[in-house]
Swiss-Prot record:
GO molecular function, one term: nucleotide binding
Localization of this protein: Cytoplasm
Region (Disordered): 568-607
Gene field: fimW
Motif RXXXR motif location, chain numbering: 324-328
Keywords of the record: c-di-GMP, Cytoplasm, Nucleotide-binding, Virulence
Annotated protein name in UniProt: Cyclic-di-GMP receptor FimW
Organism: Pseudomonas aeruginosa (strain ATCC 15692 / DSM 22644 / CIP 104116 / JCM 14847 / LMG 12228 / 1C / PRS 101 / PAO1)
Length: 607
């Protein structure tokens, strides 16, 4: 049964048991039991830890003894959860039953660990003894750190945070603050990038996560952020919500993360906690402005895996208040959506494969023959009348399939199978519109969500069949309680030209052609022409070759306008064009010319 202290909103059981079923309740016996868990069998280890924690939380124990035993369990729970993550991270957004159960098991393990530390807090809270201040601080810090695990995992899975979790985090910090132990140093062996964390620093980690717009981030970036917040939490402090610098405030009576101060009435500020993120944002922006060679000397503490894209996102999320440019309108109807650069390129190109997009689009003039001319060899033994010759048929190709619109292909035609295969590779989805604005849409996934869907992914949108495809990006994803999965789509451009893009290198061989999209300039809003490229290998200053329907021209990529984990968008300027012989089509690298021609082709560019 759960007990809620009259002065505390911490959910804990009332211990009633005198013994453990699996060993004696001594540090020596618990240590031996933990050391002999079947670590090679992760499932069995998790089961025994789960049952062991439940029993431990029902056991009547003095505070010091409980803390000793929990400290032995803590690294084992951390080990199991870290190794179980591969079963549910980097999967489809909506998990199948097995990975969902594994994720729930990790949540339960860390929740039961947190319950153990909350029992210490509840037992110690009435004593108010200075001699036991350090023990009280350790109990609160460990409870906050244990609750942080389910919060990070919910963010990574785009799920709602467990009910009551934010309330308990706020309550734990307030208890520490009231006793004056919130800034006591607490050693923490599980902290990866600092020897210890005070209660205030431990509390700042979930607060900063809560206002970092994690639903716009990818799972690996959320994990890196949670790590780097350990050293970053030392750069900030909790202050009064009434101070001018408090951009975000947390209201302890509200079960939710910090929000912009301007969203709360003045009457709620008196009891609220404020966060001034400006010192951290200034360090991030200072790092971003430094030349690459000098970033190692920057004042901002960093860890491996924190990318420039992540820093730019955090600079925006923790910077000045973001205001919605357009008002949302409740939507109705559906949109057709495709996911990823390859699919969008394919549909923009009229369902043509990439190698065809790179060829010169010509309608060869059909040769004219006189039917009444007598062939001197017509009577030869091996002469056979050609009945299936097609005008403009390339003589070096064995088979030629004229391009036809998918609508014109009969179901029994051999090409119907090829087009069916291509469509299976690039599926489309009809999604209901939740709401919309001139800047984008909120769409709902009523059924299974494809594994490819991630925040920052490029998508194509089509209003009606046969209409042009618009270019957009997935800005955020969330799972709604009893409401499936929703995502926010931001429009990039109403149209684009599919093309091939090749990175030109001076000292090595140039890259193969990769899919890219050309977006025209819009003079009315002073927007220059841009190109959307894959995330790698292109960067600012890269010299590239653009292949548009077989016509090649060179360009230089200038300022990067946008970047996600899937694509980059660059401004570009034309460089010296490369003239393509009109009698020789340009094809993708997979379509190899004869050996002699290939050797000469590589020679022309090096002369």
């Amino acid at each position: 049964m759960e007990n809620q202290s009259p002065h505390l909103s911490l959910r804990v059981p009332t211990p009633t048991q005198q013994n453990l079923s699996f060993c004696d309740a001594t540090p020596k016996d618990i240590k031996y039991w933990l050391a002999h868990l079947p670590k090679a069998n992760l499932g069995e280890t998790a089961r025994q830890l789960y049952q062991g924690l439940i029993e431990l939380n029902q056991l009547v124990l003095p505070v010091e003894a409980r803390l000793q035993l929990l400290e032995l369990f803590r690294p084992e729970v951390h080990f199991v959860c870290a190794h179980l993550e591969r079963h549910f991270l980097n999967q489809a957004i909506v998990l199948d039953e097995r990975p969902r159960k594994i994720a729930n098991l990790c949540q339960a393990l860390q929740n039961h660990l947190a319950i153990g530390y909350k029992l210490i807090v509840v037992q110690e809270a009435p004593r108010n003894s200075r001699d036991r201040a350090q023990l009280f601080a350790v109990g609160i810090q460990r409870a906050i750190r244990s609750l942080c695990g389910p919060l990070i995992r919910a963010s990574q899975l785009y799920c709602p945070v467990p009910e009551g979790l934010w309330l308990e985090l706020h309550q734990l910090y307030q208890l520490a603050s009231q006793r004056g132990v919130h800034r006591l140093a607490v050693r923490d062996e599980l902290a990866k990038h600092t020897p210890g964390l005070s209660v205030e620093q431990a509390y700042l980690i979930p607060l900063l996560l809560g206002c970092a717009r994690c639903n716009q981030m990818r799972q690996n970036n959320i994990a890196r952020l949670a790590e780097v917040l350990e050293p970053w939490s030392q750069l900030l402090s909790i202050q009064s919500a009434t101070l001018p610098g408090s951009l975000f405030i947390a209201v302890p009576q509200i079960d939710g993360p910090p929000r912009y101060r301007s969203l709360y009435p003045e009457t709620q500020l008196a009891s609220a906690l404020g966060i001034d993120t400006q010192p951290l944002v200034e360090l991030i922006r200072e790092y971003l402005l430094q030349p690459e060679a000098e970033r190692a000397k920057a004042r901002l503490p960093l860890i491996e895996g924190v990318t420039l894209d992540l820093l730019q996102h955090l600079s925006s999320a923790w910077g000045d208040i973001a205001e919605r440019t357009f008002q949302r309108t409740q939507g109705q109807g559906q949109l057709t959506l495709c996911i990823g650069m390859s699919a969008l390129h394919y549909f923009l190109a009229g369902r043509r494969p990439f190698n065809e997009v790179l060829q010169i689009q010509e309608a060869p003039e059909a040769p004219r023959f006189k039917a009444d001319v007598q062939d001197a060899w017509a009577g030869a033994f091996d002469a056979q009348k050609v009945t299936d010759w097609q005008p403009g048929m390339p003589l070096e190709e064995i088979e030629y399939r004229p391009h036809q619109s998918p609508r014109s292909v009969q179901p029994g035609h051999p090409q119907a199978h090829a087009q069916a295969d291509a469509t299976e590779d690039y599926p489309t989805y009809a999604l209901p519109i939740v709401n919309h604005s001139p800047g984008g849409y909120c769409l709902s996934w009523p059924k299974e969500v494809p594994a490819q869907l991630q925040a920052g992914e490029l998508v194509g949108l089509q209003d009606l069949p046969g209409q042009a495809w618009s270019i957009a990006v997935v800005r955020w994803i969330r799972q709604v309680r009893n409401g499936g999965t929703q995502m926010g789509i931001e429009m990039i451009a109403p149209a684009a030209q599919p093309c091939g893009l090749q990175l030109l290198r001076k000292t090595e061989q140039s890259s193969h052609y990769l899919r890219a999209l050309l977006l025209p300039a819009i003079a009315a809003i002073s927007r220059p022409a841009t190109v959307i490229t894959p995330r790698l290998p292109f960067q600012e200053g890269s010299r590239v070759q653009i292949n548009l329907h077989g016509e090649e021209r060179r360009a230089v990529l200038n300022r990067r306008q946008a970047s996600t984990g899937s694509f980059s968008q660059f401004e570009y300027r034309s460089a010296e064009p490369v003239n393509t012989p009109s009698d020789k089509p340009v094809t993708a690298p997979v379509a190899r010319p004869p050996a002699g021609e290939e050797d000469f082709d590589s020679l022309w560019k090096s002369l």
